Amino acid sequence: KEFPGISITNSNVEAATGADIVILAVKPWFMEPVMRELKLKSKQILISVAAGISFEELAHYVVAPEMAMFRLIPNTAISELESMTLVAARNTNDEQDKFILRLFSEMGTVMLIPEDKIAAATALTSCGIAYVLKYVQAAMQAGIEMGLRPKDAMQMIAQSLKGAAALIQNNDTHPSVEIDKVTTPGGITIKGINELEHNGFTSAIIKAMKASK
């Protein structure tokens, strides 16, 4: 076998039987029939990747509602091992929490948060990645209009975003601190920032995030 110790099956029941950890990565509307079919045991750990399905709802679908449960919300950057993955836990202990966080940290950054913060955090991470890409798209259009080739413009913007993220992550600084370093009096950057604000940039971002909650 190419991957010794790994079994593949088309049967959900067969896959879950005897498993220590069961990961349910199905659409929310499939969750109830799949859960009813599985009849998970209290000693198993359930991980749900279905958005919008609360622990309370999951508890209704399982035979043992006291079982350890995790809700996981990754974003599409998981395909590049750069996901910002949100994790909420119920009926778990420290050892289980640490194991799950370590497991999914292989695919990016993980953060354990209370379940009641999941909706707000999802707006920033899962939805937010689309808003960042929308900025990339708009900036590319500006670059093309100013005479740059599309591929060059995209590379410039993507690397600039990567660098901006590194500045605040590696130095633990606030974005405003890094912005101040670039905005010299009467310079081109402050003119551009003022133009963004005159056109409601900050307000639009806040409204988009709140609309996605």
Model-flagged regions — what are they?
Residues 57-68, 84-121, 131-172:
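Internal alpha-helical scaffold of NAD(P)-dependent oxidoreductase catalytic cores
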Residues 124:
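Alpha-helical membrane segments and immediately flanking helix-loop junctions
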Residues 3, 11-87:
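Rossmann-like NAD(P)(H) cofactor-binding subdomain of soluble oxidoreductases
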Residues 15, 31, 149-156, 178, ...:
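Small-residue helix-packing motif on alpha-helices
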Residues 158-213:
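NAD(P)-dependent Rossmann-like dehydrogenase/reductase catalytic/cofactor-binding core
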Residues 7-12, 111-113:
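Short acidic-hydrophobic, aromatic-tinged amphipathic segments that line or gate anion-handling sites
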